[in-house]
Amino acid sequence: MALVDKHKVKRQRLDRICEGIRPQIMNGPLHPRPLVALLDGRDCTVEMPILKDLATVAFCDAQSTQEIHEKVLNEAVGAMMYHTITLTREDLEKFKALRVIVRIGSGYDNVDIKAAGELGIAVCNIPSAAVEETADSTICHILNLYRRNTWLYQALREGTRVQSVEQIREVASGAARIRGETLGLIGFGRTGQAVAVRAKAFGFSVIFYDPYLQDGIERSLGVQRVYTLQDLLYQSDCVSLHCNLNEHNHHLINDFTIKQMRQGAFLVNAARGGLVDEKALAQALKEGRIRGAALDVHESEPFSFAQGPLKDAPNLICTPHTAWYSEQASLEMREAAATEIRRAITGRIPESLRNCVNKEFFVTSAPWSVIDQQAIHPELNGATYRYPPGIVGVAPGGLPAAMEGIIPGGIPVTHNLPTVAHPSQAPSPNQPTKHGDNREHPNEQ
């Protein structure tokens, strides 16, 4: 009995010595792990196998920034996100330890990349995973406008009788031949070029406008380049948008530019909703200045025909921001996003990152090893950090864990690692923004 008591005393003495060196670990390995959070999704089964040996992967399933859990705000050093939420400077300042954000998709207009860079947060995207899907969807929309398959289907569903030549002429009114038509592409990046290759096979003459692209690409693809937006709008029978959204091209298609288009031209947008002034488009459709439009993206998402200026617009096809999607593309995007996070953990930020889009705004550069690791985590891969506080789950494939004490409170940590603080207001480098760099003319989403 005395031997047992002696052992207990010795154990208590060791516990007092170790107290403050590292927190109590409820399960998993004893080494520190950075927290990486999927902000607006709930499935991290693809990401976990890539990151589980380096980081703890959790998900928030937030539908707005207000739903991001306090634990993630305080402790996450890496974040992955889709297009559901928007991170402004005010939102980014709430993150205490964040160093890298990876947008699972090509567009990054839902993140303030300048503010992120000034706060020492790298922002990355996945520019190439859904190029084929977006190009295929764009061609589908263009063919639909020219051949009117959607409206013909609707007519049959409504019971319209179509038999005589006169009835066919009436129900298919507006259908047009494609060969010899001019397709104008605004933006000629990966997706724009993929659309051009496909469109030529259908007989389109393809022209494009892209002020950021170097000369010569038009010769390799057998297309024509124009050097002003006005020239493209004037020459095109169908205009398709393939550029990212930024502060310079918001409402690029507006009442003024619509009046520069050919009478009865078509408009397709599978890039970003903010590129098109929907009020001006609705008016142009009603007046017949635009013969038809197909939109996969909208100014306000999720889109509803019941609301907004397009609810009464004729000759309009809308899809719910799905042009980017296929199972293969989704899987490739998620794998690429997790791999980019892995590069950040094992290398330097932003130098080691493959697709960092805000390097010109970045004010700090350091290896991951000097990140302020305020959270030393047990291996709780798949944990859910979301509101209301106290709700905890494990994603499919996650390891079962003792959750008590993890949600909602944090784990106190004492360490000797140097602190990396986010400057409250750091000046932007005296370096012009290159809007053509690191951009993909559209999207996933």
Swiss-Prot record:
The active site is at residues 272, 301, 321. PROSITE patterns: D_2_HYDROXYACID_DH_3. Corepressor targeting diverse transcription regulators. Functions in brown adipose tissue (BAT) differentiation. PANTHER family: C-TERMINAL-BINDING PROTEIN (PTHR46029), C-TERMINAL-BINDING PROTEIN 2 (PTHR46029:SF3). GO terms for cellular component: nucleus; synapse; transcription repressor complex. It holds the Pfam family 2-Hacid_dh_C. It is found in: Nucleus; Synapse. Disulfide bonds: none annotated. The gene is CTBP2. Belongs to the D-isomer specific 2-hydroxyacid dehydrogenase family. The modification Phosphoserine is found at residue 428. Gene3D superfamilies: NAD(P)-binding Rossmann-like Domain. Keywords: Differentiation, Host-virus interaction, Methylation, NAD, Nucleus, Oxidoreductase, Phosphoprotein, Repressor, Synapse, Transcription, Transcription regulation. Can form homodimers or heterodimers of CTBP1 and CTBP2. Interacts with HIPK2 and ZNF217. Interacts with PRDM16; represses white adipose tissue (WAT)-specific genes expression. Interacts with PNN, NRIP1 and WIZ. Interacts with MCRIP1. NAD(+) binds at residues 106, 186-191, 210, 243-249, 270-272, 296, 321-324. One of its GO terms (molecular function) is NAD binding. Its main location: nucleus. Ubiquitous. Highest levels in heart, skeletal muscle, and pancreas. This is C-terminal-binding protein 2. Residues 414-445 are annotated as: Disordered. The modification Asymmetric dimethylarginine is found at residue 22. The keyword Endoplasmic reticulum does not apply.
